[in-house]
C-alpha cells in the first residue's frame, strides 16, 4: 500500500470543519455544550482551525461514566470541540484507509455492520464443520499506543496528520487496563508504556481496526 500524504489541507479546511461540527452534533444538538459552541460557531471553528494550523491544539478532559449492560464498560465522553476535531480527521483518513481493509472487516464501516457479518458467518458455518468463537479481553484498554502509532506510520506519511493523531492518542484518559505483559514484550518498560483508547471517541472506533487488519496481514 502506498502511504497516504497531503491529508492536512483537507483536515483543516474550514468547510470540512463545518461538516465535522454538523456530524458531531447529530442527536446532541440541544445539549448545553453544543448550543454554546454553535452560538458562536464561526468563531469557534476559526479558533480550532488556528490551533490546528499553529499546532497549539490540546484535547480537553474526558467526562466518564460506566455502563453495565451487557458487561461493565468505562465510557469516556470527549468535549464537544474535540469531537469536532475527531470528525474532521476521520473525514480525511477513513475513506482511503477503508479501501485497504479486508472484505471481512465489518465494524464501523459504511455498508457493512452486524447484518452483513451475520450473513457472511452463516455462509462460512454451512461450509465448515468447526467454528472458532473468540474475543479479545479488554481490547480497547489494552491497545498499546506505541504499536498503534507505528502501524499508522506504515499507512500515513503526512507529518501534520500524524501529529494530530498522536495528540489524540496521547490525550487518552486512563482506561483501567490490567497491565499484563508478555515475555519478550520489551518495546518499552511497563511503567513507560501507555495503553488504552477511550470507548466513546470516533477515532477509537476506527483506528483500532488498523491494528486488527495489520495483525491479519502479518
Region locations from a protein language model:
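Non-catalytic, polymerase-adjacent accessory regions of viral genome-replication enzymes
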Residues: 1-46
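Active-site-proximal segment of RNA-dependent polymerases
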Residues: 7, 90-144
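Short, compositionally biased low-complexity segments
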Residues: 11-26, 59-64, 91-96, 126
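Active-site-flanking structural segment that lines cofactor/substrate pockets
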Residues: 41-72
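Conserved polymerase palm-domain catalytic core
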Residues: 44, 51, 104, 123-218
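Generic hydrophobic/packing signal
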Residues: 52, 56, 69-71, 81, ...
Amino acid at each position: 500500500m502506498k502511504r497516504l500524504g497531503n491529508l492536512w489541507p483537507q483536515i483543516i479546511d474550514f468547510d470540512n470543519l463545518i461538516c465535522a461540527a454538523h456530524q458531531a452534533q447529530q442527536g446532541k444538538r440541544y445539549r448545553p455544550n453544543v448550543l454554546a459552541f454553535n452560538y458562536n460557531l464561526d468563531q469557534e471553528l476559526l479558533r480550532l482551525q488556528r490551533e490546528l494550523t499553529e499546532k497549539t491544539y490540546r484535547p480537553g478532559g474526558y467526562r466518564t461514566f460506566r455502563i453495565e449492560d451487557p458487561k461493565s464498560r468505562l465510557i469516556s465522553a470527549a468535549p464537544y470541540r474535540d469531537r469536532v476535531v475527531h470528525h474532521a480527521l476521520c473525514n480525511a483518513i477513513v475513506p482511503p484507509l477503508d479501501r485497504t481493509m479486508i472484505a471481512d472487516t465489518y465494524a464501523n464501516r459504511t455498508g457493512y455492520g452486524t447484518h452483513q457479518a451475520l450473513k457472511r458467518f452463516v455462509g462460512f458455518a454451512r461450509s465448515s464443520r468447526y467454528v472458532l468463537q473468540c474475543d479479545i479481553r479488554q481490547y480497547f484498554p489494552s491497545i498499546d499506543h506505541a504499536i498503534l502509532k507505528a502501524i499508522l506510520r506504515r499507512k500515513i506519511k503526512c507529518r501534520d496528520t500524524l501529529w494530530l493523531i498522536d495528540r489524540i492518542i496521547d490525550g487518552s484518559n486512563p482506561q483501567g487496563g490490567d497491565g499484563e505483559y508478555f515475555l519478550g514484550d520489551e518495546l518499552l518498560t511497563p511503567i513507560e508504556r501507555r495503553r488504552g483508547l477511550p470507548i466513546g471517541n470516533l477515532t477509537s472506533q476506527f483506528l483500532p481496526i488498523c491494528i486488527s487488519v495489520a495483525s491479519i496481514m502479518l
